[in-house]
């Protein structure tokens, strides 16, 4: 097995805090250093800067977990791939808490650009994931976008949306 450590809410950290955190993690026996855009507020440029900072201190595998509050999860995942991040999280239809994650099907399209290999995946999405998405209401919306802009945790949005006053 492999052990990964995930730095959560990385956009909220200064570069000094990121450096200090990586230095602490280096003292462990972790195999992979992950970072998460927990609020879905990163853009490609900041993603690239964070990756370069981590890689300047960490020689083992790296990973990224993106959220799609502002519709940038795919863009940030591609940026991570272009900057040699080894592990890229994605989920079918972006399934995940709140606004969701990088969509597997979009990532495959961007990486392969071979639509004929996606028929089975698209059937899976249509028949199974879209009904689940409708039932459990994941995916981005203006509330999650606003939350991403203002560093508001997705839990607050979920609680607000489930409250009959809103």
Where are the regions a protein language model picked out?
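Catalytic cores and adjacent flexible loops of soluble metabolic enzymes
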Residues: 1-166
């Amino acid at each position: 097995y492999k052990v990964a450590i995930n730095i959560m809410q990385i956009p909220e950290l200064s570069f000094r805090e990121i450096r200090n955190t990586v230095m602490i993690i280096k003292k462990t026996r972790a195999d992979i250093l992950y970072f998460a855009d927990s609020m879905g507020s990163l853009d490609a440029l900041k993603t690239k800067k964070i990756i370069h900072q981590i890689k300047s201190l960490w020689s083992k595998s790296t990973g990224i977990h993106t959220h799609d509050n502002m519709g940038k999860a795919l863009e940030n995942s591609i940026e991570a791939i272009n900057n040699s991040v080894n592990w890229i999280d994605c989920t079918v239809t972006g399934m995940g808490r709140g606004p969701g994650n990088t969509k597997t099907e979009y990532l495959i399209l961007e990486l392969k650009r071979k639509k004929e290999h996606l028929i089975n995946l698209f059937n899976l999405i249509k028949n199974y994931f879209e009904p689940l998405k409708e039932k459990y209401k994941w995916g981005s919306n203006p509330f999650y976008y606003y939350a991403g802009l203002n560093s508001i945790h997705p839990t607050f949005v979920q609680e607000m949306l489930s409250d009959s006053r809103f």
